[in-house]
Curated annotation (Swiss-Prot):
Gene Ontology cellular component annotations, sorted alphabetically: nucleus
InterPro entries reported in the protein's UniProt record: Ankyrin_rpt-contain_sf, SBP-like, SBP_dom, SBP_sf
The protein's name in its UniProt record: Squamosa promoter-binding-like protein 6
Annotated Polar residues bias: 393-419
Role this protein plays: Trans-acting factor that binds specifically to the consensus nucleotide sequence 5'-TNCGTACAA-3'.
Gene: SPL6
Binding residue positions for Zn(2+) 2: C193, C196, H200, C212
Chain intervals with Low complexity compositional bias: 55-74, 420-431
UniProt remark on domains: The SBP-type zinc finger is required for the binding to DNA.
Annotated segments matching region Disordered: 1-25, 54-81, 377-434
Placement of sequence motif Bipartite nuclear localization signal: 209-225
Key words of the record: DNA-binding, Metal-binding, Nucleus, Transcription, Transcription regulation, Zinc, Zinc-finger
Amino acid sequence: MEAARVGAQSRHLYGGGLGEPDMDRRDKRLFGWDLNDWRWDSDRFVATPVPAAEASGLALNSSPSSSEEAGAASVRNVNARGDSDKRKRVVVIDDDDVEDDELVENGGGSLSLRIGGDAVAHGAGVGGGADEEDRNGKKIRVQGGSPSGPACQVEGCTADLTGVRDYHRRHKVCEMHAKATTAVVGNTVQRFCQQCSRFHPLQEFDEGKRSCRRRLAGHNRRRRKTRPEVAVGGSAFTEDKISSYLLLGLLGVCANLNADNAEHLRGQELISGLLRNLGAVAKSLDPKELCKLLEACQSMQDGSNAGTSETANALVNTAVAEAAGPSNSKMPFVNGDQCGLASSSVVPVQSKSPTVATPDPPACKFKDFDLNDTYGGMEGFEDGYEGSPTPAFKTTDSPNCPSWMHQDSTQSPPQTSGNSDSTSAQSLSSSNGDAQCRTDKIVFKLFEKVPSDLPPVLRSQILGWLSSSPTDIESYIRPGCIILTVYLRLVESAWKELSDNMSSYLDKLLNSSTGNFWASGLVFVMVRHQIAFMHNGQLMLDRPLANSAHHYCKILCVRPIAAPFSTKVNFRVEGLNLVSDSSRLICSFEGSCIFQEDTDNIVDDVEHDDIEYLNFCCPLPSSRGRGFVEVEDGGFSNGFFPFIIAEQDICSEVCELESIFESSSHEQADDDNARNQALEFLNELGWLLHRANIISKQDKVPLASFNIWRFRNLGIFAMEREWCAVTKLLLDFLFTGLVDIGSQSPEEVVLSENLLHAAVRMKSAQMVRFLLGYKPNESLKRTAETFLFRPDAQGPSKFTPLHIAAATDDAEDVLDALTNDPGLVGINTWRNARDGAGFTPEDYARQRGNDAYLNMVEKKINKHLGKGHVVLGVPSSIHPVITDGVKPGEVSLEIGMTVPPPAPSCNACSRQALMYPNSTARTFLYRPAMLTVMGIAVICVCVGLLLHTCPKVYAAPTFRWELLERGPM
C-alpha cells in the first residue's frame, strides 16, 4: 500500500501504523494497489489475485529506476499478526512548492499519493528510521538521508542531495552548481545545461546562455515555424473557449483529489471558485452538474483559503476580460502554479473556432500535467526567468505554452496507425477482399478503482460499444488508479467513427452496462487524438487534441525492432519530444508491463537536432510474441511502436526494416508508404504470434479466424525481401491451423500460391534452396509425405520453375539450385518436362542461347545419371577351398554398362542401313572436315599435273612425283 500524509502529521498505512489488518474499501482505492498482487489475462480482460506464496517470489513487473532516487520499492509488512507476505510500496516525493526547511516538521514528512505512478513517502513513520528490503534485494530508507545518499557530481562538492528537490537528486547536481557558470566535473571545466540537464564543456555554450548551443538551435528553430493564422469567432466562441479551459483546469485538480495534502486544500478551494464563476462564463454548462466532481473531495479536511478564492476569481475575471478583448488578445490558459494542481499544465484542447496569433509574452517554463502523477518533480521556472512573474494565462504563441494548441483548429486530426502520420499508405490487409484495417489503442483511466472492481464481462462490454467487432484484441493494466490499455485491429472507418462520435459511444457504453462500474467515479478515455472525461455517468468533456504541433511526443523508431526471447536487450528509442518532466517510457508484452521508467533517467546524448534518444535495458520473456514501447507524455500521448520477440534467425531478418524507419526519421521523407507498410507488417506478424500463443496455452478464448488474405500479404512481404526464416514460420503456422483456409488443405493452399515460381522470377537462389528443402514437421497435422515444392511443379500455362530459369538470363545460381533438389527431380525432368506448347527447359535454353545452362546441366546428368555402374556380389558364406574357375560361392566383381533403350527411327532409314552395311565408311566421308581436306588435295594434284613441271621446294630436296612412296599414313 502507499504511505500518505494528512496535514503535517505523517503515518504509514502498513504495519503498526494502521492498527487493524483489514483496511476498508475506500482506503484500498485511495492508496493504490500492487501490480504483483494480480495476474492479468490480456485476452479475457480478467484480473485474478496471485496467491501469497507465489507473489512473494515474484519480481516487480516494472523495473525500478536506474537512478539512486528510484521512484518505487516494494517492502514487506512484518506486523504482529505475522502477515509477512503482504507487500507495500514506499517512495519519495518532493514538493517544490514548499521550502526545504518545511519538508520535515515536528517529526513528520510530506507524504502524498502519486496517481498512476509510484507512490512516494518522505518523512517519518513507523519504522521510518530503519532500512527496508524490497523484492529485488535493494535497500531504501523511508525517512531522512543517509551518508551514502546521492551527492553532487561536481568535484569537491559535499552537498547532500537527500533533502533537496527531485530534479537535483535525479541529475546529481546541487542547486548552486546547477546555476553556476563553471564547475569542475571529470577534471574538466564544464557548465550545467538547463535544457539537457547535464554538464557540457564551456565551448558548447554561447556567452551568457544557460543552455548549450545545440539545444538552443533546435528550440529557436521550432519557435520560428509558422503558426496558423486564425481569427476570433464571436461571443459564443468566447464562452465555449473559456468553458473548455476552465473545465480542463478542473480536470487537473480532480487528477490529484486522492492526496491528503495541505497544498491540495487550496486546489479544493480553487475548484469551488471556478465552479462559482463557470456558470457566468459558459451558459451551456450547468455548474450544478459540475459540482458532482467535488464528491471525491469530501474526505479532505474542511478549510478556507481566502487567497486561493481570490486567485480563482482573478483567473476567471482575467479569462473573461482577455477573451472578450480585441482580436489580438491572449488565449486564456490556467497556470498550474497558481491553481495548485498536480502539475502546472492543463490539457490543451483543440477549439472549434480559430484563434489569433499574438506576440510572445515573457517566457516561463511550462510544467506538463500528468493524470498519473501528483507532481512532475521539475523546477517551476527556468533560471533565466526567475524574476518573471507567474502569469495566470499564457498565449498560444508562447514558446513555453503547450504547442498542441498551435495546430489549426479547423483541421481534423489525421487518423494514423501506430506512430505513422501518413494516411495515404495502403495497409497490408487492405487488398484482395479484406477491408483496410489499422492497429491502434484505446486508453481507459479508471480513478478510484482497484482490479477487484473490474467486472468479469469487461471484455464483452468493451466489444459491445464498438461499432464493429475487432479482428484482434489484447490489453494490459498497470497501477495509478487502473490504466487499462486495449490494442485493437479495427476497420479504418470504425476508428474514425469512434473518434468522431465519442460522446454517443460513451453514452452507449453507459446505457448497455448492467452494473455501476462505468457510471461511478472518474473515467478518462482516449481514442487516438480524442479525449473524453466522465464523472458518475455524466460526460463532462469530449474534445480533440491537436497532435501535429512541435511538442507532441512521437516515437520514430525502436531498435532493435526484433529481439530473441529469453535474452536481455538494450533498446534504443528515437523520437520527437520524448523527454519532459512528466513523460514516462513503458514497455509491455502480452498483457504485462515489463519495464517503465521516467524518460529523464534514460535519455541519451542528442545526436540530431530534433531527434531525442532513450536507452533502456529490459529482460525479455521466454516466448514468442509482439510487444509495445510507449512514451506517455503527461497522460495525453497515444503513440506506440511494436517490436517482435522470436528466434534469432527471424529477428535478424525482421531487423532489416530498421533502415526504413531510420531513413524516414532522419530525412523526413514525404512519402511514408514504406514506413507504414513496415509498421503494418510488424503489427500483423504480432497478431499472428499472439494468436499462436493463445492456441499453445489451449485457452478457450473466442478468436476470429485469421483471414487468408492477411496471411497471404504477410507471405508476399517476406518473399519480396527473401526472408527464409520468416517464410518458414508462416508456413509452419499454416500447417498448425492458425489460418482460416476453408475446405482446402494446407498443401493445396501453399502450392496454389506458386511460391517456387515467384522465387525463380526474383532470381533468389537462397529462397529456391529453402523452398526445395522445406518439409512440414511430421509431428504437425496434415503433413505431406514428400517435399512440398518440386522443380517440375506446373504453374500457369504448365510452366515449371525449370522453364522459367532456362528462359531467364543470368540465372545460373537459380538453375543450379533447381537441379540440386533433394529428390534429383530437376535433372531428371530437364529434358522431359514440357509446357503447354510442348517445349522442354532444354529447348528454352537452346533457343535463348544459354550454352552455360546446357553445359552445367549436362555435367550434372553425366555425374548423377551416368551409364557406368559397379555391381559387387557378396556371398552368404565364405568357402576356404580355392579351385580353378568361378564357383557360385565366390566373390565376383562385374563392371557392366547400362543399355539405353533404342531410339525410335523411321522404316526408310532402317532399310537403307541394311542395303549398305558399311555405314561407317560411308558416313565418314560426309564429315565436313574430311571434305575440306580432300578438296584441297584434289586442287593441288590438278595444278601440279597441269604445270608439268617439278615444284621447287627450297626448304627440302626437290620434290618429284615418281619418288612419292605409297603406303598407309
